[in-house]
């Protein structure tokens, strides 16, 4: 089993959550330990080399099959690139989880690091 940190369309209440994560164990809400930059250009994405804000999201425990399905959705490794990062859960616990990064910035900067702020 692996942990995956989701910050956009895979979060609960967004369009990709049910098809991909409805049977996965919810671990908790949290944010990245390090700062990154979130942009939206139709869909949200995070850029690793810009240090703007902590990215807000949710952690799920997923099996290998689910992780491969998410890799396919995200176009890993050709479109998004998956990397393990430290996540601080709202409980205060720190865990390592996969996060999908995009290689370049374009679109609208989400300064808060929370896609829900952008979506209203």
Curated annotation (Swiss-Prot):
CDD domains xref list: GGCT_like
Classification via SUPFAM superfamilies: Gamma-glutamyl cyclotransferase-like
Residue positions of the active site: 74
Lipid metabolism recorded as keyword: no
EC code: 2.3.2.-
Binding residue positions for substrate: 7-10
Annotated GO CC locations: cytosol
Superkingdom, natural source: Archaea
Signal peptide: none
Keywords: Acyltransferase, Transferase
Role according to the record: Putative gamma-glutamylcyclotransferase.
Family to which the UniProt record says this protein belongs: Belongs to the gamma-glutamylcyclotransferase family.
Protein name: Putative gamma-glutamylcyclotransferase MJ1514
Lineage, top ranks: Archaea, Methanobacteriati, Methanobacteriota, Methanomada group, Methanococci
């Amino acid at each position: 089993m692996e942990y995956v940190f989701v910050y956009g369309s895979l979060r609960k209440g967004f369009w990709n959550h049910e098809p991909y994560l409805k049977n996965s164990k919810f671990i908790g809400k949290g944010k990245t330990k390090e700062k990154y930059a979130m942009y939206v250009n139709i869909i949200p994405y995070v850029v690793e080399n810009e240090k703007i804000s902590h990215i807000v999201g949710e952690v799920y425990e997923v099996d290998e099959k689910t992780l491969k399905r998410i890799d396919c959705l995200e176009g890993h490794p050709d479109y998004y690139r998956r990397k393990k990062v430290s996540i601080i859960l709202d409980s205060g616990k720190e865990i390592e989880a996969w996060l999908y990064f995009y290689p370049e910035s374009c679109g609208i900067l989400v300064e808060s690091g929370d896609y829900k702020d952008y979506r209203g």
